[in-house]
Structure formats: C-alpha cells, structure tokens
Amino acid sequence: MAPSADEVAVRAALQHYIQGHATGDSSHMRLAFHRQARLFWSSADTLATRTSDEYIQRMGSGKPAADEATGVRKRRIELVDVTGNAAIGKIVLDYPEAHIVDYMSLLKTNGEWKIINKIFMTEMKKK
C-alpha cells in the first residue's frame, strides 16, 4: 500500500532533520523543528533539556563534518507512525564516534508537520 500524504510529509520533515546533520546547514533544521520544540536526554542519569533554537545554534560552522564525503556517517529513518495530526519517527545516526537514536514527536499545525519534541540517546563507540 502506498504511504498516505501525511506519512510522506512526516518523512519529509524528518529528512530535513537528516539533511541538517549531513550538511551542517541550520536552515534544514529550522524546516524540521517547530519553533517551540524541545529536546530531552539523560546525562549522567539526570534529565537534560534544551530548546530547538539552542540545539540549532550549537550545530557549528554550517558546513558538513570533515569526513562526510567518505560515507562513514550513516543516517536512516527507521520508523514512522501517523495517527490523525500526530506522528512519531525514529531516526538512527551511526557515526564513527557514536551511535545515536532519536525519537521524534511531530504534530501537524497550520497544514505543516513539524518536530515538537525530540528525545535521544547517544552511545559512544570504543576507539
């Protein structure tokens, strides 16, 4: 069965997020995240949080990682589930130094799907 228009739009929002990581271009992230979005994670067993604006500003130089062209950085959308105007997405970022799993909550507002919440875990790889 072909994906619904909403599933295609959710995947497009998640793809903007992935492109932001791949290119270092914050404009992709701004297309992915709602302006009021928040990020949460556990650091040393303590809840940590930041706004999407803070996250996007910390992205760095606006250029791709030095090893981006080598193909060692892998990114994929593993799951999308849409119900009405709410959706979830699971993204896996497999980098040489870390394995990251992002769980995104998305809402459709004003006809657009945006990430409104991100929780994630990072597992550093042994060198």
Model-flagged regions — what are they?
Residues 9, 38-99:
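Surface-exposed, charged secondary-structure patches
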